[in-house]
Design a protein with these regions (language model features):
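Short beta->alpha connector loops at strand-helix junctions that form conserved
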Residues: 89, 107-112
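Phosphate-binding glycine-rich loop
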Residues: 34, 38-84, 97-102, 108
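Conserved core segment of the aminotransferase class I/II
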Residues: 178-229
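Pyridoxal 5′-phosphate
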Residues: 5, 17, 53, 76, ...
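Active-site phosphate-binding strand-loop segment of PLP-dependent enzymes
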Residues: 113-184, 190-192, 196
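Conserved coil-to-alpha-helix start sites within the AMP-binding
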Residues: 90-96
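N-terminal "arm"/small-domain region of PLP-dependent enzymes with the aminotransferase-like
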Residues: 1-34
Length: 229
């Protein structure tokens, strides 16, 4: 052992390479006085929707909140109580947490050698309302005809930039955690979908139910600084 220390992340090196650009745009946002819900947020959401070949994108505080938004929305769309969601055995705990917090019963399915849900091991004797697909380490989730008639939700925190950003789910949760594919220097997430009702639900959820207050929500907005970065 020669005492060599290898950094766990390369965030410092990345920041040093982008420092001038990051500081310039951060200063621009702060000098504008528009710290939330401004042009950078709108531009980033528009870019995300186009990048993912989807109609809509809504930013939020984190990938975990993006999953919660999706889970709560689809729980309200079903008469089954509690609805059941199947998630892969290999995923971060936030995937399960989001659905449990939203009132779902979570069933765990074993994975294949790539860490993705193995359709051969899916529970056939259960009534399932949603399948949650997770692509780990940048590996795209598999587009299988098995999913064609079911509610499919993608936890895209680690894989959304793969497979040319083609989405196969009804909705996808994205994360911009500093350790993710596209990172912010803080927290951030987004919901990507073609569902206009989900878009409106997400916008209300992230802003304490405003403006109609027909649904409850919380403060889960992504700041202008993080969107600009």
């Amino acid at each position: 052992m020669n005492g060599l220390k290898i950094p766990f992340t390369g965030l410092k090196k990345q920041y040093n390479a982008l420092r001038t650009e990051i500081l310039d745009v951060t200063d621009e946002v702060l000098r504008s006085g528009q710290l939330m819900g401004g042009n950078y947020t709108a531009e980033f959401e528009s870019w995300l929707a186009k990048k993912n070949y989807s109609k809509y994108a809504v930013t939020c505080h984190s990938g975990s909140h993006a999953l919660e938004i999706i889970a709560e929305y689809y729980r309200l769309q079903t008469s089954v109580n509690p609805p059941r969601a199947v998630i892969p055995a290999m995923t971060y705990v936030a995937t399960a947490n989001a659905f449990i917090r939203a009132g779902w019963e979570v069933n765990i399915c074993d994975t294949d050698v790539y860490g993705q849900m193995d359709i051969q091991k899916l529970p056939r004797d259960l009534s399932v309302q949603a399948y949650v697909l997770v692509g780990l380490y940048g590996s795209a989730v598999k587009d299988n005809k098995f999913w064609s008639t079911d509610l499919i939700i993608e936890d895209g925190a680690q894989h959304w930039l793969s497979n040319n950003c083609n989405r196969i789910g009804n909705a996808t949760a994205l994360s911009f955690d500093p350790m993710k594919n596209l990172n912010a220097y803080g927290n951030g997430g987004a919901v990507v979908t073609d569902d206009l009702d989900l878009l409106e639900f997400a916008r209300e959820w992230t802003n304490n139910g405003k403006p109609k207050h027909t649904n409850i929500g919380t403060n889960s907005r992504m700041s202008e600084i993080e969107c600009a970065q």
